Amino acid sequence: MPGVAMRELPQTAPLIDVHAHFYHEGAGRSDWARLNDARVRAGDTIGVTYHVASVLGSYGHTSPTYFPSPADVTRGNDAMAALAASQADRVRWYATVNPNDTRHALAEIERCVALSAVGVKLLASRRADDPLVDPICELAARQRLPVLHHIWQHRTRDWPNQEISDGLDLACLAARHPKVTFILAHLGGGGDWAHTLPAIRETPNVVADLSGSGVDRGMLDQAVEILGARRLLWACDLTMETGLAKLRALDVIGLAEGDVMDVRWRNAARIFATGTFPRCELA
Amino acid sequence: MIDCAAWIGPYPFREVPHPDPATLVRVLERERLTGAWVGHLPSAWHRDPRPGNAALFAALAPYPTLLPAPMIRPDWPGWEQMLADVVAKGAVAIRAYPQHWGIQPGDSRMNALARACATSARPLLLTVRFEDLRQRSPLDVAGDLSAAHVRALARTGEDVCIVVTGAGRELIEETHWGLTPVERGRVYWDFAWVWGPPEEHFAHLLRTMGAERFVYGTHWPLRLTQNSRANLDLLPADQRDPGITDAGSLSPRFVREMPT
Protein backbone atom coordinates (compact mmCIF):
# COMPACT_ATOMS: atom_id res chain seq x y z
CA MET A 1 0.00 0.00 0.00
CA PRO A 2 1.62 3.26 -1.06
CA GLY A 3 2.51 5.63 1.72
CA VAL A 4 2.34 3.25 4.65
CA ALA A 5 5.46 1.45 5.69
CA MET A 6 5.35 -2.32 5.64
CA ARG A 7 8.36 -2.87 7.81
CA GLU A 8 10.34 -6.03 8.05
CA LEU A 9 8.89 -7.79 11.04
CA PRO A 10 11.25 -8.69 13.87
CA GLN A 11 12.24 -12.32 13.62
CA THR A 12 15.67 -12.31 15.15
CA ALA A 13 15.23 -12.11 18.91
CA PRO A 14 13.19 -14.65 20.88
CA LEU A 15 9.64 -13.68 21.73
CA ILE A 16 7.27 -15.37 24.17
CA ASP A 17 3.54 -14.68 24.26
CA VAL A 18 2.60 -15.57 27.84
CA HIS A 19 -1.13 -15.06 27.35
CA ALA A 20 -2.65 -16.94 24.44
CA HIS A 21 -5.77 -19.04 23.94
CA PHE A 22 -6.70 -21.88 21.68
CA TYR A 23 -10.09 -23.35 20.86
CA HIS A 24 -11.45 -26.84 20.38
CA GLU A 25 -14.46 -28.57 18.93
CA GLY A 26 -16.37 -28.29 22.21
CA ALA A 27 -16.00 -24.52 22.25
CA GLY A 28 -19.25 -23.88 20.41
CA ARG A 29 -17.66 -22.35 17.36
CA SER A 30 -17.56 -24.07 14.03
CA ASP A 31 -14.52 -21.99 13.07
CA TRP A 32 -12.42 -23.11 16.03
CA ALA A 33 -9.69 -24.65 13.88
CA ARG A 34 -9.45 -21.49 11.75
CA LEU A 35 -8.94 -19.43 14.91
CA ASN A 36 -6.13 -21.71 16.05
CA ASP A 37 -4.50 -21.59 12.63
CA ALA A 38 -4.81 -17.81 12.54
CA ARG A 39 -3.05 -17.48 15.89
CA VAL A 40 -0.16 -19.65 14.79
CA ARG A 41 0.10 -17.89 11.44
CA ALA A 42 0.05 -14.42 12.99
CA GLY A 43 2.51 -15.58 15.61
CA ASP A 44 4.88 -16.69 12.89
CA THR A 45 4.51 -13.32 11.17
CA ILE A 46 5.22 -11.45 14.40
CA GLY A 47 8.07 -13.77 15.30
CA VAL A 48 6.57 -15.50 18.34
CA THR A 49 8.89 -18.26 19.50
CA TYR A 50 6.49 -19.72 22.06
CA HIS A 51 2.78 -19.30 22.74
CA VAL A 52 1.93 -20.03 26.39
CA ALA A 53 -1.75 -20.75 26.09
CA SER A 54 -4.84 -21.98 27.83
CA VAL A 55 -8.27 -23.24 26.92
CA LEU A 56 -11.10 -21.72 28.96
CA GLY A 57 -13.38 -24.72 29.31
CA SER A 58 -16.07 -24.59 26.64
CA TYR A 59 -15.88 -20.79 26.24
CA GLY A 60 -19.48 -20.49 27.35
CA HIS A 61 -20.88 -23.21 25.15
CA THR A 62 -21.80 -25.69 27.86
CA SER A 63 -20.83 -23.72 30.98
CA PRO A 64 -19.85 -20.07 31.45
CA THR A 65 -16.42 -19.01 30.24
CA TYR A 66 -15.39 -17.63 33.60
CA PHE A 67 -17.24 -20.24 35.67
CA PRO A 68 -16.44 -23.46 33.81
CA SER A 69 -17.86 -26.72 35.07
CA PRO A 70 -15.41 -29.44 36.15
CA ALA A 71 -16.25 -31.46 33.05
CA ASP A 72 -15.58 -28.50 30.78
CA VAL A 73 -12.35 -27.67 32.63
CA THR A 74 -11.10 -31.19 32.06
CA ARG A 75 -12.20 -31.33 28.44
CA GLY A 76 -10.60 -27.96 27.73
CA ASN A 77 -7.34 -28.94 29.38
CA ASP A 78 -7.29 -32.19 27.44
CA ALA A 79 -7.72 -30.25 24.21
CA MET A 80 -4.98 -27.87 25.24
CA ALA A 81 -2.63 -30.72 26.12
CA ALA A 82 -3.26 -32.37 22.77
CA LEU A 83 -2.60 -29.17 20.87
CA ALA A 84 0.58 -28.49 22.83
CA ALA A 85 1.77 -32.03 22.15
CA SER A 86 1.13 -31.59 18.44
CA GLN A 87 3.07 -28.30 18.38
CA ALA A 88 5.67 -29.05 20.98
CA ASP A 89 8.24 -26.80 19.34
CA ARG A 90 6.21 -23.64 19.97
CA VAL A 91 3.28 -24.13 22.36
CA ARG A 92 3.35 -24.35 26.16
CA TRP A 93 0.26 -24.33 28.32
CA TYR A 94 -1.47 -23.48 31.55
CA ALA A 95 -3.81 -25.79 33.41
CA THR A 96 -7.11 -23.93 33.71
CA VAL A 97 -9.03 -24.53 36.94
CA ASN A 98 -12.11 -23.27 38.76
CA PRO A 99 -11.34 -22.83 42.48
CA ASN A 100 -14.98 -23.38 43.44
CA ASP A 101 -14.44 -27.09 42.87
CA THR A 102 -11.36 -27.27 45.02
CA ARG A 103 -10.74 -31.01 44.91
CA HIS A 104 -11.20 -31.11 41.18
CA ALA A 105 -8.98 -28.06 40.70
CA LEU A 106 -6.12 -29.54 42.73
CA ALA A 107 -6.39 -32.90 41.01
CA GLU A 108 -6.57 -31.20 37.64
CA ILE A 109 -3.37 -29.28 38.25
CA GLU A 110 -1.55 -32.48 39.21
CA ARG A 111 -2.96 -34.26 36.16
CA CYS A 112 -2.09 -31.44 33.78
CA VAL A 113 1.45 -31.05 35.08
CA ALA A 114 1.93 -34.73 34.36
CA LEU A 115 0.74 -33.92 30.84
CA SER A 116 3.34 -31.10 30.56
CA ALA A 117 1.45 -27.99 31.77
CA VAL A 118 3.89 -25.29 32.87
CA GLY A 119 1.56 -22.97 34.81
CA VAL A 120 -1.91 -22.43 36.23
CA LYS A 121 -4.62 -20.27 34.70
CA LEU A 122 -7.19 -18.73 37.02
CA LEU A 123 -10.20 -17.03 35.49
CA ALA A 124 -12.79 -14.93 37.26
CA SER A 125 -14.53 -17.77 39.05
CA ARG A 126 -13.62 -16.51 42.50
CA ARG A 127 -12.18 -13.18 43.61
CA ALA A 128 -8.41 -13.36 43.80
CA ASP A 129 -8.15 -12.60 47.52
CA ASP A 130 -10.69 -15.29 48.46
CA PRO A 131 -9.27 -17.99 50.78
CA LEU A 132 -10.62 -20.61 48.41
CA VAL A 133 -7.79 -19.74 46.06
CA ASP A 134 -5.15 -20.50 48.70
CA PRO A 135 -4.95 -24.29 48.22
CA ILE A 136 -4.33 -23.77 44.53
CA CYS A 137 -1.55 -21.31 45.23
CA GLU A 138 -0.02 -23.63 47.80
CA LEU A 139 0.10 -26.37 45.18
CA ALA A 140 1.50 -23.92 42.62
CA ALA A 141 4.25 -23.04 45.10
CA ARG A 142 5.12 -26.70 45.64
CA GLN A 143 5.14 -27.36 41.92
CA ARG A 144 6.87 -24.02 41.13
CA LEU A 145 4.14 -23.05 38.69
CA PRO A 146 3.43 -19.43 37.76
CA VAL A 147 -0.22 -18.44 38.05
CA LEU A 148 -1.77 -16.35 35.29
CA HIS A 149 -4.78 -14.58 36.83
CA HIS A 150 -7.54 -12.91 34.81
CA ILE A 151 -7.76 -9.30 35.99
CA TRP A 152 -10.00 -6.32 35.47
CA GLN A 153 -7.96 -3.15 35.76
CA HIS A 154 -9.56 -1.28 38.66
CA ARG A 155 -12.91 -2.84 39.37
CA THR A 156 -15.39 -0.15 40.32
CA ARG A 157 -18.43 -2.39 40.15
CA ASP A 158 -19.34 -5.95 39.35
CA TRP A 159 -19.62 -6.94 35.72
CA PRO A 160 -21.85 -9.71 34.46
CA ASN A 161 -20.60 -13.24 33.94
CA GLN A 162 -17.46 -12.92 36.01
CA GLU A 163 -16.38 -12.46 39.62
CA ILE A 164 -13.77 -9.94 38.77
CA SER A 165 -10.55 -9.15 40.55
CA ASP A 166 -8.25 -6.20 40.17
CA GLY A 167 -4.65 -5.42 40.99
CA LEU A 168 -5.38 -4.80 44.65
CA ASP A 169 -7.13 -8.16 44.99
CA LEU A 170 -4.27 -9.98 43.31
CA ALA A 171 -1.73 -8.15 45.46
CA CYS A 172 -3.53 -9.50 48.57
CA LEU A 173 -3.31 -13.04 47.26
CA ALA A 174 0.30 -12.61 46.21
CA ALA A 175 1.27 -11.32 49.64
CA ARG A 176 -0.04 -14.55 51.15
CA HIS A 177 1.95 -16.65 48.68
CA PRO A 178 5.33 -14.97 48.23
CA LYS A 179 6.88 -18.05 46.62
CA VAL A 180 4.46 -17.97 43.72
CA THR A 181 4.87 -15.67 40.73
CA PHE A 182 1.53 -14.23 39.70
CA ILE A 183 1.07 -12.93 36.19
CA LEU A 184 -1.49 -10.15 36.21
CA ALA A 185 -3.41 -10.64 33.00
CA HIS A 186 -3.85 -8.11 30.23
CA LEU A 187 -2.78 -4.73 31.52
CA GLY A 188 -4.39 -3.37 28.35
CA GLY A 189 -7.46 -5.53 28.68
CA GLY A 190 -10.04 -3.17 30.00
CA GLY A 191 -10.54 -0.97 33.01
CA ASP A 192 -7.99 1.49 34.29
CA TRP A 193 -4.43 0.29 33.92
CA ALA A 194 -3.19 3.43 35.66
CA HIS A 195 -4.79 2.14 38.87
CA THR A 196 -3.23 -1.30 38.53
CA LEU A 197 0.37 -0.18 38.37
CA PRO A 198 0.57 1.38 41.87
CA ALA A 199 -1.73 -1.36 43.18
CA ILE A 200 0.91 -4.03 42.56
CA ARG A 201 4.06 -1.94 42.77
CA GLU A 202 4.98 -3.09 46.29
CA THR A 203 4.23 -6.76 45.61
CA PRO A 204 7.27 -8.00 43.73
CA ASN A 205 5.92 -11.47 43.02
CA VAL A 206 3.25 -9.94 40.78
CA VAL A 207 4.31 -9.29 37.20
CA ALA A 208 2.09 -7.86 34.48
CA ASP A 209 1.42 -9.05 30.98
CA LEU A 210 0.89 -6.34 28.38
CA SER A 211 -1.86 -8.02 26.43
CA GLY A 212 -5.37 -6.78 25.74
CA SER A 213 -7.07 -4.75 23.06
CA GLY A 214 -6.07 -1.48 24.73
CA VAL A 215 -3.18 0.40 23.16
CA ASP A 216 -3.30 3.60 25.15
CA ARG A 217 -0.32 5.85 24.66
CA GLY A 218 1.43 6.24 27.98
CA MET A 219 0.58 2.78 29.28
CA LEU A 220 3.92 1.21 28.41
CA ASP A 221 5.88 4.23 29.62
CA GLN A 222 4.13 4.24 32.99
CA ALA A 223 4.40 0.47 33.35
CA VAL A 224 8.14 0.68 32.86
CA GLU A 225 8.42 3.65 35.19
CA ILE A 226 6.38 2.12 38.02
CA LEU A 227 7.11 -1.61 37.75
CA GLY A 228 10.33 -1.70 35.77
CA ALA A 229 11.03 -3.72 32.65
CA ARG A 230 11.81 -6.87 34.65
CA ARG A 231 8.21 -7.11 35.81
CA LEU A 232 6.61 -6.86 32.37
CA LEU A 233 5.83 -9.68 29.97
CA TRP A 234 4.87 -9.27 26.33
CA ALA A 235 1.60 -10.97 25.38
CA CYS A 236 -1.34 -10.76 23.00
CA ASP A 237 -4.42 -12.51 24.43
CA LEU A 238 -7.31 -12.11 21.96
CA THR A 239 -5.90 -9.34 19.76
CA MET A 240 -2.57 -10.03 18.15
CA GLU A 241 -2.45 -6.75 16.24
CA THR A 242 -2.37 -4.87 19.54
CA GLY A 243 0.41 -7.19 20.65
CA LEU A 244 2.43 -6.33 17.58
CA ALA A 245 1.73 -2.62 18.09
CA LYS A 246 3.00 -2.79 21.66
CA LEU A 247 6.02 -4.80 20.57
CA ARG A 248 6.92 -2.08 18.07
CA ALA A 249 6.22 0.62 20.63
CA LEU A 250 8.72 -0.99 23.02
CA ASP A 251 11.39 -0.07 20.50
CA VAL A 252 10.55 3.65 20.54
CA ILE A 253 9.84 4.50 24.17
CA GLY A 254 13.47 4.71 25.16
CA LEU A 255 14.11 1.28 26.64
CA ALA A 256 17.61 -0.15 26.67
CA GLU A 257 18.03 -3.19 24.45
CA GLY A 258 18.38 -5.43 27.47
CA ASP A 259 15.09 -4.16 28.86
CA VAL A 260 13.36 -4.92 25.58
CA MET A 261 14.77 -8.44 25.68
CA ASP A 262 13.50 -8.83 29.25
CA VAL A 263 9.98 -7.93 28.17
CA ARG A 264 10.15 -9.98 24.96
CA TRP A 265 11.27 -13.25 26.57
CA ARG A 266 13.86 -13.18 29.35
CA ASN A 267 11.39 -12.41 32.14
CA ALA A 268 9.22 -15.32 31.01
CA ALA A 269 12.24 -17.59 30.91
CA ARG A 270 13.06 -16.57 34.49
CA ILE A 271 9.52 -17.06 35.76
CA PHE A 272 8.79 -20.44 34.25
CA ALA A 273 10.79 -23.55 35.07
CA THR A 274 14.24 -23.87 33.57
CA GLY A 275 14.07 -25.65 30.25
CA THR A 276 10.54 -24.54 29.44
CA PHE A 277 11.64 -22.54 26.40
CA PRO A 278 14.65 -24.31 24.92
CA ARG A 279 14.59 -22.43 21.61
CA CYS A 280 14.86 -19.13 23.48
CA GLU A 281 17.57 -20.33 25.78
CA LEU A 282 19.61 -21.54 22.81
CA ALA A 283 19.33 -18.11 21.23
CA MET B 1 -1.20 8.01 3.12
CA ILE B 2 -3.12 10.39 5.38
CA ASP B 3 -3.99 9.61 8.99
CA CYS B 4 -7.64 10.63 9.22
CA ALA B 5 -7.90 10.35 13.01
CA ALA B 6 -5.50 12.53 14.96
CA TRP B 7 -5.93 15.27 17.49
CA ILE B 8 -3.84 17.73 19.41
CA GLY B 9 -4.46 18.96 22.91
CA PRO B 10 -5.14 17.33 26.26
CA TYR B 11 -7.74 14.70 27.01
CA PRO B 12 -10.03 15.54 29.93
CA PHE B 13 -10.02 12.14 31.60
CA ARG B 14 -6.39 11.09 31.71
CA GLU B 15 -2.91 12.31 30.93
CA VAL B 16 -1.76 11.66 27.37
CA PRO B 17 1.92 12.17 26.61
CA HIS B 18 2.97 15.13 24.47
CA PRO B 19 -0.25 15.85 22.55
CA ASP B 20 1.38 18.67 20.62
CA PRO B 21 1.78 19.22 16.87
CA ALA B 22 5.57 19.00 16.81
CA THR B 23 5.43 15.55 18.38
CA LEU B 24 2.71 14.50 15.94
CA VAL B 25 4.86 15.55 13.00
CA ARG B 26 7.72 13.37 14.29
CA VAL B 27 5.37 10.43 14.81
CA LEU B 28 3.95 10.74 11.29
CA GLU B 29 7.46 10.80 9.86
CA ARG B 30 8.41 7.75 11.90
CA GLU B 31 5.31 5.94 10.67
CA ARG B 32 5.94 7.17 7.11
CA LEU B 33 2.54 8.83 6.85
CA THR B 34 2.31 11.89 4.63
CA GLY B 35 0.06 13.89 6.92
CA ALA B 36 -2.95 13.86 9.19
CA TRP B 37 -6.40 15.33 9.57
CA VAL B 38 -6.01 16.91 12.97
CA GLY B 39 -8.71 17.93 15.41
CA HIS B 40 -8.64 19.76 18.72
CA LEU B 41 -9.21 17.06 21.30
CA PRO B 42 -10.68 19.07 24.18
CA SER B 43 -13.19 20.69 21.84
CA ALA B 44 -15.24 17.52 21.86
CA TRP B 45 -16.28 18.47 25.41
CA HIS B 46 -16.59 22.21 24.77
CA ARG B 47 -19.88 23.91 24.13
CA ASP B 48 -18.74 26.78 21.88
CA PRO B 49 -16.56 25.39 19.07
CA ARG B 50 -14.93 28.67 18.17
CA PRO B 51 -12.12 28.91 20.76
CA GLY B 52 -11.01 25.36 20.09
CA ASN B 53 -11.08 25.86 16.35
CA ALA B 54 -9.06 29.05 16.67
CA ALA B 55 -6.51 27.25 18.81
CA LEU B 56 -6.36 24.41 16.28
CA PHE B 57 -5.65 26.64 13.28
CA ALA B 58 -3.04 28.60 15.22
CA ALA B 59 -1.27 25.49 16.46
CA LEU B 60 -1.17 23.80 13.05
CA ALA B 61 -0.12 26.83 11.04
CA PRO B 62 3.62 26.06 11.14
CA TYR B 63 3.12 22.42 10.10
CA PRO B 64 2.03 21.89 6.48
CA THR B 65 1.47 18.16 6.90
CA LEU B 66 -1.02 18.70 9.72
CA LEU B 67 -4.35 19.46 8.09
CA PRO B 68 -7.03 21.08 10.22
CA ALA B 69 -10.26 19.19 10.81
CA PRO B 70 -12.19 21.59 13.04
CA MET B 71 -15.46 20.96 14.82
CA ILE B 72 -18.81 22.38 13.72
CA ARG B 73 -21.91 21.74 15.81
CA PRO B 74 -25.14 22.35 13.94
CA ASP B 75 -27.12 23.20 17.05
CA TRP B 76 -24.95 26.28 17.66
CA PRO B 77 -26.11 29.70 16.46
CA GLY B 78 -24.32 30.81 13.33
CA TRP B 79 -22.88 27.40 12.50
CA GLU B 80 -23.32 27.94 8.75
CA GLN B 81 -21.03 30.97 8.83
CA MET B 82 -18.65 29.12 11.11
CA LEU B 83 -18.44 26.35 8.54
CA ALA B 84 -17.79 28.81 5.74
CA ASP B 85 -15.05 30.45 7.81
CA VAL B 86 -13.17 27.24 8.59
CA VAL B 87 -13.46 26.09 4.98
CA ALA B 88 -11.99 29.39 3.84
CA LYS B 89 -9.14 28.91 6.31
CA GLY B 90 -8.25 25.49 4.92
CA ALA B 91 -10.25 22.90 6.82
CA VAL B 92 -9.96 19.57 5.00
CA ALA B 93 -12.70 17.78 6.94
CA ILE B 94 -15.35 18.72 9.49
CA ARG B 95 -15.59 16.95 12.81
CA ALA B 96 -18.89 16.44 14.58
CA TYR B 97 -19.71 14.65 17.84
CA PRO B 98 -23.51 14.30 17.87
CA GLN B 99 -23.44 11.90 20.80
CA HIS B 100 -21.68 14.56 22.91
CA TRP B 101 -24.33 17.12 22.02
CA GLY B 102 -27.30 14.90 22.73
CA ILE B 103 -28.27 14.87 19.07
CA GLN B 104 -30.20 11.76 18.17
CA PRO B 105 -30.02 9.79 14.90
CA GLY B 106 -31.95 11.44 12.09
CA ASP B 107 -31.91 14.88 13.69
CA SER B 108 -32.51 17.48 10.99
CA ARG B 109 -29.68 19.66 12.25
CA MET B 110 -27.06 16.96 11.75
CA ASN B 111 -28.55 16.18 8.37
CA ALA B 112 -28.19 19.83 7.46
CA LEU B 113 -24.56 19.79 8.52
CA ALA B 114 -23.90 16.71 6.40
CA ARG B 115 -25.42 18.41 3.37
CA ALA B 116 -23.50 21.61 4.03
CA CYS B 117 -20.25 19.67 4.25
CA ALA B 118 -21.11 18.01 0.94
CA THR B 119 -21.70 21.40 -0.62
CA SER B 120 -18.30 22.47 0.61
CA ALA B 121 -16.74 19.21 -0.63
CA ARG B 122 -15.55 18.36 2.86
CA PRO B 123 -15.94 14.94 4.44
CA LEU B 124 -17.92 14.83 7.65
CA LEU B 125 -15.69 13.14 10.22
CA LEU B 126 -17.39 11.20 13.02
CA THR B 127 -15.77 9.53 16.04
CA VAL B 128 -17.41 6.47 17.53
CA ARG B 129 -15.38 6.59 20.75
CA PHE B 130 -12.27 7.99 22.29
CA GLU B 131 -11.74 5.24 24.86
CA ASP B 132 -12.82 1.71 25.54
CA LEU B 133 -16.13 1.65 27.39
CA ARG B 134 -14.53 -0.37 30.19
CA GLN B 135 -12.13 2.36 31.18
CA ARG B 136 -14.31 5.38 30.60
CA SER B 137 -14.64 7.96 33.33
CA PRO B 138 -17.99 8.06 35.13
CA LEU B 139 -18.14 11.68 33.99
CA ASP B 140 -17.83 10.65 30.33
CA VAL B 141 -21.46 9.73 29.75
CA ALA B 142 -21.88 10.56 26.06
CA GLY B 143 -21.77 6.96 24.92
CA ASP B 144 -20.65 5.67 21.56
CA LEU B 145 -21.84 6.97 18.23
CA SER B 146 -24.52 4.62 16.96
CA ALA B 147 -24.93 2.91 13.62
CA ALA B 148 -28.30 4.64 13.36
CA HIS B 149 -26.51 8.02 13.40
CA VAL B 150 -24.31 7.00 10.51
CA ARG B 151 -27.08 5.41 8.47
CA ALA B 152 -29.23 8.51 8.78
CA LEU B 153 -26.40 10.79 7.68
CA ALA B 154 -25.45 8.55 4.75
CA ARG B 155 -29.00 8.94 3.42
CA THR B 156 -29.04 12.74 3.44
CA GLY B 157 -27.76 13.37 -0.06
CA GLU B 158 -25.80 12.02 -2.97
CA ASP B 159 -22.68 14.14 -2.42
CA VAL B 160 -22.36 13.33 1.25
CA CYS B 161 -19.00 11.88 2.29
CA ILE B 162 -18.74 10.48 5.81
CA VAL B 163 -15.62 9.16 7.47
CA VAL B 164 -16.23 7.18 10.66
CA THR B 165 -13.35 6.52 13.01
CA GLY B 166 -13.11 4.21 16.00
CA ALA B 167 -15.78 1.69 15.01
CA GLY B 168 -15.55 -2.04 15.56
CA ARG B 169 -16.79 -4.79 13.28
CA GLU B 170 -20.31 -4.88 14.70
CA LEU B 171 -21.08 -1.21 14.14
CA ILE B 172 -19.43 -1.20 10.73
CA GLU B 173 -21.45 -4.16 9.50
CA GLU B 174 -24.69 -2.94 11.02
CA THR B 175 -24.27 0.33 9.18
CA HIS B 176 -22.87 -0.95 5.91
CA TRP B 177 -25.45 -3.66 5.29
CA GLY B 178 -28.22 -1.33 6.41
CA LEU B 179 -27.53 1.02 3.51
CA THR B 180 -28.15 0.74 -0.20
CA PRO B 181 -25.08 0.16 -2.39
CA VAL B 182 -25.13 3.83 -3.35
CA GLU B 183 -25.40 4.96 0.27
CA ARG B 184 -22.57 2.62 1.31
CA GLY B 185 -20.35 4.37 -1.17
CA ARG B 186 -20.64 7.55 0.86
CA VAL B 187 -19.17 6.06 4.03
CA TYR B 188 -15.54 5.30 4.84
CA TRP B 189 -14.20 3.62 7.96
CA ASP B 190 -10.91 3.57 9.74
CA PHE B 191 -9.83 0.24 11.24
CA ALA B 192 -7.95 1.34 14.35
CA TRP B 193 -10.46 -0.43 16.61
CA VAL B 194 -11.13 -3.43 14.37
CA TRP B 195 -9.71 -6.71 15.62
CA GLY B 196 -7.03 -8.53 13.71
CA PRO B 197 -5.99 -12.16 14.25
CA PRO B 198 -6.96 -14.61 15.49
CA GLU B 199 -10.58 -13.38 15.11
CA GLU B 200 -9.57 -11.59 11.88
CA HIS B 201 -12.44 -9.13 11.83
CA PHE B 202 -10.42 -6.77 9.66
CA ALA B 203 -9.68 -9.43 7.06
CA HIS B 204 -13.35 -10.39 7.08
CA LEU B 205 -14.49 -6.81 6.49
CA LEU B 206 -12.01 -6.33 3.67
CA ARG B 207 -13.34 -9.46 2.00
CA THR B 208 -17.02 -8.67 2.43
CA MET B 209 -17.11 -4.88 2.05
CA GLY B 210 -14.09 -4.15 -0.11
CA ALA B 211 -10.83 -2.46 0.84
CA GLU B 212 -11.90 0.81 -0.78
CA ARG B 213 -14.30 1.44 2.13
CA PHE B 214 -11.39 1.73 4.58
CA VAL B 215 -9.07 4.59 5.39
CA TYR B 216 -6.07 4.84 7.69
CA GLY B 217 -6.51 6.32 11.16
CA THR B 218 -4.35 6.11 14.26
CA HIS B 219 -6.26 7.92 17.06
CA TRP B 220 -3.09 9.68 18.14
CA PRO B 221 -2.47 10.95 20.84
CA LEU B 222 -4.81 8.56 22.62
CA ARG B 223 -3.64 5.29 21.08
CA LEU B 224 -0.41 3.80 19.79
CA THR B 225 0.05 4.79 16.17
CA GLN B 226 1.60 1.37 15.50
CA ASN B 227 -1.74 -0.40 15.84
CA SER B 228 -3.27 0.29 12.43
CA ARG B 229 -0.15 -0.71 10.59
CA ALA B 230 0.08 -3.85 12.71
CA ASN B 231 -3.44 -4.69 11.56
CA LEU B 232 -2.34 -4.36 7.95
CA ASP B 233 0.84 -6.34 8.49
CA LEU B 234 -1.03 -9.27 10.04
CA LEU B 235 -3.52 -9.71 7.24
CA PRO B 236 -3.53 -13.19 5.69
CA ALA B 237 -1.17 -13.58 2.77
CA ASP B 238 -3.94 -13.33 0.17
CA GLN B 239 -4.95 -9.92 1.54
CA ARG B 240 -1.61 -8.21 1.86
CA ASP B 241 -1.47 -4.74 0.34
CA PRO B 242 -5.27 -4.51 0.23
CA GLY B 243 -5.54 -1.12 -1.46
CA ILE B 244 -7.39 0.90 1.13
CA THR B 245 -8.47 4.44 0.34
CA ASP B 246 -6.18 7.36 1.13
CA ALA B 247 -8.34 9.79 3.10
CA GLY B 248 -6.40 12.55 1.40
CA SER B 249 -8.22 11.70 -1.80
CA LEU B 250 -11.60 12.45 -0.24
CA SER B 251 -11.10 16.21 -0.25
CA PRO B 252 -8.67 16.63 -3.16
CA ARG B 253 -9.40 20.22 -3.96
CA PHE B 254 -8.50 21.41 -0.52
CA VAL B 255 -5.48 19.43 0.59
CA ARG B 256 -2.67 21.78 1.36
CA GLU B 257 0.46 21.37 -0.66
CA MET B 258 2.75 18.78 0.82
CA PRO B 259 6.51 19.18 1.07
CA THR B 260 8.30 16.91 -1.37
Which residues fall in each region the model found?
Chain A
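Conserved, mostly hydrophobic/aromatic
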Residues: 19, 43, 80, 112, ...
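Active-site gating/metal-coordination segments in enzymes
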Residues: 67-155
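Catalytic pocket-lining loop regions of alpha/beta-barrel enzymes
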Residues: 117-119, 131-233, 281-282
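Acidic/histidine-rich helix-loop elements
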Residues: 22-34, 61-71, 159
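Active-site neighborhood of phospho(di)ester-bond hydrolases with catalytic His/Asp-centered motifs
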Residues: 15-18, 52-54, 94-96, 121, ...
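Mid-to-C-terminal alpha-helical segments outside catalytic/metal-binding sites
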Residues: 1-22, 27-51, 222, 226-231, ...
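Divalent metal-dependent hydrolysis catalytic cores, especially in the metallo-beta-lactamase
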Residues: 20, 38-66, 91-96, 118-121
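Active-site environment of divalent metal-dependent phosphoester hydrolases
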Residues: 23-25, 58-61, 99-103, 127-128, ...
